[in-house]
């Protein structure tokens, strides 16, 4: 008999754990089940990681596994810091710090690893954005350049042209705030001038000479600042290295005039980290959230 790969055994075990938890809560309402059994979220996250790393599994990850994780993070991160309330001129609002929220991802790209080419037409992008908002997304993140491994890097001009074909329509139709996923300050300035609500910089203000931070400060919008690096080599402890990165990021942000209450941090799961390093960061996430009392975004 052929030996079953270890990763598949772990996958089956995690599926069994989730099944037992769901069965034990069969008498409860669905929302109560999620609140009462947050441990299922961690098993669900392991399932997601394994699912995408097993080449012989062709079916997409079932949606149920994306539901548990945000509920768990509300407990794990201990969201006791003051609530951040954001309100924009167009009437849109966002409250961070009280409960965990879900960000919807809209990639208007032809080559993103998860959904490249699915939403890069006006009709499909509008439909998907509205569906995510209806399903409970508190904000929508729009990206015009893929950041998957091996992606083709765009110039700021190319990214801006692709984004601005759709952004005005999305802003006009959206019922929730829209953030822009870009590390090009030129693209971000165009998007913010068109009415975008938030910055999402996957290089944490460290891609350029401070221009992205200056643009963010000029428009007075919230900014999601992510940890990233070009390789997976860390000298010493990974959390210590990430803290050094965030120290630089915060120094750049505050020096440029970005208000502290508008800063959101992201540990960059899947960026500049191996699978094992990702799991270590998740296991030690509270070390970061305690060191930096800001709202935190997790990409899962």
Region roles according to the model:
Residues 76-107:
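N-terminal amphipathic alpha-helix/helix-capping segment at the start of soluble metabolic enzymes
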Residues 106, 136, 199, 265:
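Conserved, mostly hydrophobic/aromatic
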Residues 110-125, 235-239:
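Active-site mouth loops of central-metabolism enzymes
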Residues 113-114, 139-164, 269, 274:
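Glycine-rich, proline-tolerant flexible connector loops at the mouths of alpha/beta enzymes
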Residues 124-142, 193-194, 250:
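Alpha/beta enzyme core
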Residues 147, 206-274:
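Conserved anion-binding
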Residues 152-164, 186, 206-219, 279:
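Active-site-adjacent beta->alpha loops and helix N-cap segments on the catalytic face
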Residues 153-179, 218-222, 285-296:
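Alpha-helix-loop-beta-strand connector modules within alpha/beta enzyme cores
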